[in-house]
């Protein structure tokens, strides 16, 4: 019975729960890796050994957080749980494929861990650039295992994307048009389209790298007429949409949370929000070379990528100001989920501002591969994506489990996390502006102060992670059941009680649209 339910599940709620659990465990692995990085950088001098092991940890940290924490939780966890409930579908369009999407992830994770255990590990950075990732600089199986890991994670995401696109377009009630679906459903749909279009390009790039390493091809080897810059173009054509894949479902969740705790029945500017997400998705595909300003592109190419990148700030601004307009005049409830959402809006905006700075190719020549870039993308990921996940988790936890988290603990947790991540990443702007380069395990003494502050901040964040584990334990131990849910009229995922029955919407829903 247990095996049938959890190994062969075709139920979107069970699979969503599996994704959430997997993402939580992977998140703890990723956090452990990040603390190793900060421990190494907490003081000048070596701690762990050589730069190879340091770079293996950095590479693993990135892959674990992106492919095994953020994507499984946002798309697999919240997506699976909420999309069918929000559109009134009985399940996903392809329930068995849904199960396969999940079960491809543990083997993929295993291959990634194996890559760091054999030989010297893959110390390439998450970009896996040749010639460093070639079979001279990285002899042995490490990089090959990493490539296979990415293949599996990629197949998992592509199958999931097909499933979500089909479900969202095809499984709404007949009376419901696409423009009446909630914003979270829209965000998952757009994310799925981005995955479907970008991942095959990554697959092509890393497969060529695999044959370069093992079958004597020369796609990226100038000696045989290849070009390492080709790899960079292929990688970043995936890599840039990927960062929007990581944040878009978060946008959807934040829209729901802000609307809910402002006491509003709908977000401000629904169509503007949809249009903004579609614009961000489209523009995300035509700005990839801003990651490559230092490889020597023509001045007109650099001018184009600079301006195209800056244009993304417009739809992003539409979203930020629409969230603020949703808050305006509302009956604001200062719940933990609302705190996460407000923290998201503020810190994501800060991360966006440093992104505008980096979009300038002339400035990026100086700031590329410094800690300024690290600070920028950790503000939008560690305080954008993660804050959205935390906000979504404390908001929908009663729906998933039927139990309530302790409000006071949840607010303390938010406060500790807020202090921790800011103390970790704000000083990195100063380090970057002072020229401290990324991906080195040691640094000149001049950089000591801010690195020490940054490392202290990371340990504050660690206490927040541990507190969250305690909070979840406390909720299941105390078993405070959900009495009543407000605003069910506009949030139909809450309509069937907490938690909802194993099968919801077994008969097609009758929808009256006003």
From Swiss-Prot:
Pathway: Energy metabolism; oxidative phosphorylation. GO terms for molecular function: cytochrome-c oxidase activity; heme binding; metal ion binding. SUPFAM superfamilies: Cytochrome c oxidase subunit I-like. The chain crosses the membrane at residues 12-40, 51-86, 95-117, 141-170, 183-212, 228-261, 270-286, 299-327, 336-357, 371-400, 407-433, 447-478. Mg(2+) binds at residues 368-369. The keyword Chaperone does not apply. Its cofactor is heme; Cu cation. There is a cross-link at residues 240-244 (1'-histidyl-3'-tyrosine (His-Tyr)). O2 binds at residue 244. Heme a3 binds at residue 376. It is a multi-pass membrane protein. Keywords: Calcium, Copper, Electron transport, Heme, Iron, Magnesium, Membrane, Metal-binding, Mitochondrion, Mitochondrion inner membrane, Respiratory chain, Sodium, Translocase, Transmembrane, Transmembrane helix, Transport. It catalyses: 4 Fe(II)-[cytochrome c] + O2 + 8 H(+)(in) = 4 Fe(III)-[cytochrome c] + 2 H2O + 4 H(+)(out). Belongs to the heme-copper respiratory oxidase family. Component of the cytochrome c oxidase, the last enzyme in the mitochondrial electron transport chain which drives oxidative phosphorylation. The respiratory chain contains 3 multisubunit complexes succinate dehydrogenase (complex II, CII), ubiquinol-cytochrome c oxidoreductase (cytochrome b-c1 complex, complex III, CIII) and cytochrome c oxidase (complex IV, CIV), that cooperate to transfer electrons derived from NADH and succinate to molecular oxygen, creating an electrochemical gradient over the inner membrane that drives transmembrane transport and the ATP synthase. This is Cytochrome c oxidase subunit 1. The lineage of its organism: Eukaryota, Metazoa, Chordata, Craniata, Vertebrata. The gene is MT-CO1.
